Amino acid sequence: IPGAFYIKNFMQVEFYLKSLTLEDIPNHGTIHFICNSWIYNSKVYKSDRIFFANNTYLPSETPAPLLKYREEELKNVRGDGSGERKEWDRVYDYDVYNDLGNPDKGAALARPVLGGSTLPYPRRGRTGRPKTKKDPNSEKPSDFVYLPRDEAFGHLKSSDFLAYGLKSVSQDVLPVLTDAFDGNLLSLEFDNFAEVHKLYEGGVTLPTNFLSKYAPIPIVKEIFRSDGEQFLKYPPPKVMQVNKSAWMTDEEFARETIAGVNPNVIKSLEEFPPRSKLDTQSFGDHTSIITKEHLEINLGGLTVEQAIQSKKLFILDHHDYLIPYLRRINASATKTYATRTIFFLKSDGTLAPLAIELSKPHPQGDEHGPVSEVYVPAYEGVEAYIWLLAKAYVVVNDSCYHQLVSHWLNTHAVVEPFVLATNRQLSVVHPVYKLLFPHYRDTMNINSLARKSLVNADGIIEKTFLWGRYALELSAVIYKDWSLHDQALPNDLVKRGVAVKDPSAPHGVKLVIEDYPYASDGLEIWDAIKSWVVEYVAFYYKSDEVLQQDSELQAWWKELVQVGHGDLKDKPWWPKMQSRENLVEVSTTLIWIASALHAAVNFGQYPYGGLILNRPTISRRFMPEKGSAEYAALAKNPEKEFLKTITGKKETLIDLTVIEILSRHASDEIYLGERDGGDHWTSDAGPLEAFKRFGKKLAEIEKKLVQKNNDETLRNRTGPAKMPYTLLYPSSEEGLTFRGI
């Protein structure tokens, strides 16, 4: 009975082989081969292309005739680590992030290498491009960026709009906007909030004679549905669809820390005043200057000690990681503060901000500690806008941390080493390959696109986010403390003090904020993933010994830890991969990161951040001081002064264009609980049945989440903006839906 087949292409063009089905095999019926691969002319390959039937075998159980082919195919995919990779190659190998800068074009475009140095980083896929002249450690940027061929968007319509959209923003949209601003066709600043709202009503209009100088930009027609003089038209973001000023309320500001686009940073406040972990010799004393008096006026009769004891105080802390970079960031056109925000859990289950501390470096040197100021809620006169500005500085830090850490680092960059190790060490017939492979769809492609036009030197992120040229460097500083163990949702919640371990609770943890939409929905999804993984692992590994003797699995884990995440290889938290429990925990965590965690931090970007007033990405001026001309201007024209402080108009248009593309689902997206190729991904009935149960469970969870959103006693589910928290609904249509995993 055939277990594999070779294929040769004698044509000059490549073709995409989806699957092969052999019918009426004597004594066997039908055999399915799932291929999903581009086949080039056979001359470009060193060895013939082989595909295996959809049977699943541990290495020790592989039929003897197939063993040689199994090992050979893995060797082909690993390559030999040399040479520049070509379009048709299928080689997976590791490299450091040394292709973000372009030192040959000047020092302003040089960027440090991330990984293998004092700036640790997960590895990326190796391309083997030549090095730059100015820096022998940096790789030359190029138009063609190698990707193992089957990692490129191979599915048909596929997220192609993403690839093509991002490329078009930098190559087409940016130049038009730059010329329009330079030629005074667009005013440099928004004058008031109503002008921001106009973006969603009339869009950005430019004279036809100006637009006719440019070739038609297909993306503008397709994504921004514009015509005539309308250059860009944006759909109204969900956060303003019902109430245009909901974003200004304290309740919405607080709610977005637990149900917004960055819902996993807020922590329980365990000590008062909040302290810093920064070295006092280098940075002075960074203990917070927030006092009990600042808080107790709004604690409903409690003292700070009582509120901490009863777990009613929380902190959104954007202080320590930013301080060492703050002086450099503020030396550019941006001006900002490190922030600490204290929240109180009220009796109705909602959070209220009590105080915001803004800290900037001391003019006489870091060792003198920060210059800090504390702001408390105010709702009348100029002080109401001072408070609104204080919240805006907090959100700017939160936006940067969200984009560079919660989104890019924690759901994109850390996954790439798993993609590489899985392809290099686990055969396509290995059960763990089949379990994890669907969750890698497009990861390397999107990451490679990001390195080319989003997170590169002077790319879209550096242009539109406060951290500027330090954006990726700061994410490397934060990666030093990354741990796979903490990415598991229950561990993350306990570590942040927003849940406590409780064996009697449904998911083993009890939430401190009961109505915490991201956490309560997330635990349901986490549990469903874990149950599926437990069943799957038990089907193939009847004991821990079988797992310990699985040569491919052990090589996979060793390479992932020692090479893929090699800068952290000596950390004690890495599991040893000696038990089925280890494999379940690692696989569940990885699937969670690549599916639900990514959905929670990605698909809400436009619904929340599309209104720049709600999620500004840059601050350009410091807080006005009493008695200054800026303070008088704020009193006279508060909206204009607020807008002069946050993200500028040009940066806003670029930011909105990008996050609208990122927040969309493709028409052929595959959601959690679904598989490409239907039931043919494995020939084993047990896992197929378990997977169907997993799909059913997710559909049940979705019904439960819909009910929660209809429960008016759960105030954090919809908030003042009246936008139900739907980011962890498993299913979705295509487009901008604010849901879908």
Curated annotation (Swiss-Prot):
Alphabetical list of SMART domains matching this protein: LH2 (SM00308)
A biological-process GO annotation: fatty acid biosynthetic process
Keywords noted in UniProt: Cytoplasm, Dioxygenase, Fatty acid biosynthesis, Fatty acid metabolism, Iron, Lipid biosynthesis, Lipid metabolism, Metal-binding, Oxidoreductase, Oxylipin biosynthesis
EC numbers, comma separated: 1.13.11.58, 1.13.11.12
Location of the Lipoxygenase domain: 56-741
Biased composition range(s): Basic residues: 123-132
GO molecular function annotations of the record: linoleate 13S-lipoxygenase activity; linoleate 9S-lipoxygenase activity; metal ion binding
Gene Ontology annotations for the cellular component aspect, listed alphabetically: cytoplasm
Residues bound to Fe cation: 407, 412, 598, 602
Principal subcellular localization: cytoplasm
UniProt region (Disordered), positions on chain: 108-144
Bias type Basic and acidic residues, positions: 133-144
Reactions catalysed: (9Z,12Z)-octadecadienoate + O2 = (9S)-hydroperoxy-(10E,12Z)-octadecadienoate; (9Z,12Z)-octadecadienoate + O2 = (13S)-hydroperoxy-(9Z,11E)-octadecadienoate; (9Z,12Z,15Z)-octadecatrienoate + O2 = (13S)-hydroperoxy-(9Z,11E,15Z)-octadecatrienoate
Cofactor needs: Fe cation
This protein's pathway: Lipid metabolism; oxylipin biosynthesis
Domain PLAT, first and last residues per copy: 1-53
Cofactor info, note text: Binds 1 Fe cation per subunit. Iron is tightly bound.
Compartments where located: Cytoplasm
Pfam families membership: Lipoxygenase, PLAT
The family this protein is said to belong to: Belongs to the lipoxygenase family.
Record function comment: Plant lipoxygenase may be involved in a number of diverse aspects of plant physiology including growth and development, pest resistance, and senescence or responses to wounding. It catalyzes the hydroperoxidation of lipids containing a cis,cis-1,4-pentadiene structure.
Subunit structure: Monomer.
Entry protein name: Linoleate 9S-lipoxygenase
Native source species: Phaseolus vulgaris
